[in-house]
């Protein structure tokens, strides 16, 4: 199948909400080794975000059930085995994406915007691995996630407007990483607040085509700040952080 047919297949799969098919088509496009267009890049990102998102959600549900069945050994064992099955699927998906990023996408990126997009993605997928990892493995995935986010962050500050949706989305996810993975609420809040304030100060640089995306992410940054501030004051809140 040539590239245009694979892209068309990915679009059909998206309409049908068959994200595994969508991811497979965009993986094949990526493996052809050309730099992806913005549209192709977004198709790849949406496909894998849905594929991995389903497993992350399942993992949380089963982990919660497992904790509630501590008194029943048989039920707990079943819960643990099922969680491990979901974990293996999640790890395979993340490793697939990370291989595409390292082998094709980051090295082929010619524009700073693309480089930031892919490094953010690398940070995200190592973060997803960190959520289910333990011991030395967790230390490695956490360090890899932070390194990718930090590199993306440095480039975005140098090369992109504070209102750019990719720069804002990176700040959003990097702050979630600090809050959820590193348990550093102060750093998370500082990062999110700085990104929000810098974007507000330059609202006049917002272009029409990205206005909706940028303002949505700014809203998520503000929502997270509100949630995190209330949690740190001792309120019991639902830790449903917004991510991009």
Curated annotation (Swiss-Prot):
Sorted UniProt keywords: Acetylation, Cytoplasm, Phosphoprotein
Modifications made to the protein after synthesis: Phosphorylated.
Coiled-coil positions: none
InterPro entries on file: 14-3-3, 14-3-3_CS, 14-3-3_dom_sf, 14-3-3_domain
SUPFAM superfamilies the UniProt entry points to: 14-3-3 protein (SSF48445)
Site (Interaction with phosphoserine on interacting protein): 56, 127
Chain positions found as Phosphoserine: 184
Disulfide bonds: none
General function of this protein: Adapter protein implicated in the regulation of a large spectrum of both general and specialized signaling pathways. Binds to a large number of partners, usually by recognition of a phosphoserine or phosphothreonine motif. Binding generally results in the modulation of the activity of the binding partner.
Name this protein carries in UniProt: 14-3-3 protein beta/alpha
Lineage: Eukaryota, Metazoa, Chordata, Craniata, Vertebrata
Name of the gene encoding the protein in the UniProt record: YWHAB
